[in-house]
Amino acid sequence: MELTKNQVSMTKGVAILFMLLLHLFCTKNYIGLFQPTVMIGDTPLIYYFALFGDCCVAMYCFCSGYGLMSSYDKDTVGYKKNNLMRIFKLYLNFWIILIVFVLIIGPLLGMRNHYPGSFKAFILTLTAIDPAYNGAWWFLTTYILLVLTSPYLNKSIKKYHPIIILGISGIFYFIAYIQRIKGVLQLDLEWLNWLIRQVALYGTSQLPYVVGILFCHYKWYSKLNVFYQKLRFRNAFGISIIILMVIGHGIVQTLFVAPFIGITFICIFNLLYKPLWLEKVFLYFGKHSTNLWLIHMFFYMIYFKELVFAPKYPILIFTWLIILCLISSYVINFFYHPLLRILDHFTKKRIGFENKSYKLESVE
């Protein structure tokens, strides 16, 4: 049994919750921000859970690679056109958020000098060439590049042995990680530094993405599931592995291990038995994951920091941020979904996309 569409969506739901947890509480300078309820020495316990959440991007990359490879196998001929439409839908979603949070809310709060600020910054953000305003938007450019290069990655994975693919991807990841963290290569030309940065971000994101493609192509999850089902205390085993990873990452506090933790967590999470109500919760967050990714930083850091941290205690702060983001997500979708329907009608009428192959779906 391979990963289903619902399982991938649930995984994205967990990933976005990890992202919020990471950005809220992965700091030891908590005084004035929140009141920890449990301490381990001088460090809040919530810090270690938040640190574990740094695998969120790797999880999303894995899901994207897995999903796109599945789409590639189903419709190789129309794959590139589907990808272009997928990217355009993401742009459409992003532009609505850009208008609401940068062009409207920024000036209303008296922050016009920075939101939107200069025309150059706005255009570079609008095109996703070099997004400003929101630190979480860096992944927008990287994701678009991953989607655009996915046909070539898919072909390579079908052609070459997985050990060769993993070796090349691993070396690329290692070099890109050093550049991203240490900034070894710095040049005088702005556009070259931008290019180097994008290559580094792409390089640190492509490893879990490639592993996701490999999982789909070689059906590794099915093989893992066969082994897992033979275990007597399956859930206890899986939860124990997750706890050990949280402890291990608390000892080895480096972003370098994030892809390996993320990939392992995805496998265990989907193998675990979960009650139906819990699956529905994760599916719900999976559907809103794109909006939550693109807007959450406006609340906890840029515009409404004091409001978000007002509840003081981590569980209340976390819940409050989720509520604020979900309300905003519904507002965004109020505009986004009708535009998708208009676009769906236009593309089928003017471009002749087949209804079955090119039916538009929300980017969630």
Give residue spans per PLM region.
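Membrane-cytosol interface segments of multi-pass membrane proteins
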Residues: 1-174, 276, 288, 309-364
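Aromatic-anchored segments of alpha-helical transmembrane domains
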Residues: 17-25, 103, 126-129, 167-183, ...
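Interfacial loop-to-helix transition and helix-capping segments at the boundaries
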Residues: 45-57, 127-142, 179-211, 244-266, ...
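Short juxtamembrane and helix-loop transition motifs at transmembrane-helix boundaries
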Residues: 79, 97-105, 122-132, 188-194, ...
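Alpha-helical transmembrane segments of multi-pass integral membrane proteins
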Residues: 103, 209, 237-347
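Alpha-helical transmembrane segments in multipass membrane proteins, preferentially the mid-helix core
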Residues: 146-155, 210-225, 264-279
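Membrane-interfacial entry segments at the cytosolic side of transmembrane helices
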Residues: 159-166, 226-236
